[in-house]
């Protein structure tokens, strides 16, 4: 059996890792969708699709998990989004999501949709991790060490801080 899960993975953290590991116990292969793959260089989505692929690939390298990583664009046309996903991915039977819109769209196309059990959601939140990065607080223990390495390699902290700078135009 093959399953699909989509996320923004901004950044890929230990909560995400635990969900992927749990799903891998239930299916033979996982298709990991890089959602909003066209978005990057914002405070909400600071990392590129390629950087997120590096994070996930390196973090999963030590586990015996069969997976594909597929970039998924936002198309702002919800009625056909599932068809777009299907055209980009290998076939799959089951969708794992905690997102109500994704659940609805795949349910309407008769997919089996499961809600993954979130792993310590209060502690493992991409939003909170990005806030900690911005404030100069400790964030490294929330992500796999391989993700720390990628973020340091690409100067992800510097990028987030530069994105938060107020432009001169903002004052007028």
Swiss-Prot record:
Gene3D superfamilies: HUPs
Enzyme class: transferase
Keywords from the UniProt entry: ATP-binding, Cytoplasm, NAD, Nucleotide-binding, Nucleotidyltransferase, Pyridine nucleotide biosynthesis, Transferase
GO cellular component terms, semicolon-separated: cytoplasm
Gene Ontology MF annotations: ATP binding; nicotinamide-nucleotide adenylyltransferase activity
Protein's cellular compartments: Cytoplasm
Reactions the enzyme catalyzes: beta-nicotinamide D-ribonucleotide + ATP + H(+) = diphosphate + NAD(+)
E.C. designation(s): 2.7.7.1
A Pfam family recorded for this sequence: CTP_transf_like
Pathway: Cofactor biosynthesis; NAD(+) biosynthesis; NAD(+) from nicotinamide D-ribonucleotide: step 1/1
Gene Ontology annotations of biological process type: NAD biosynthetic process
PANTHER family: BIFUNCTIONAL NMN ADENYLYLTRANSFERASE_NUDIX HYDROLASE, PHOSPHOPANTETHEINE ADENYLYLTRANSFERASE
Homology family: Belongs to the archaeal NMN adenylyltransferase family.
Protein name: Nicotinamide-nucleotide adenylyltransferase
Phylogenetic classification of the source organism: Archaea, Methanobacteriati, Methanobacteriota, Methanomada group, Methanococci
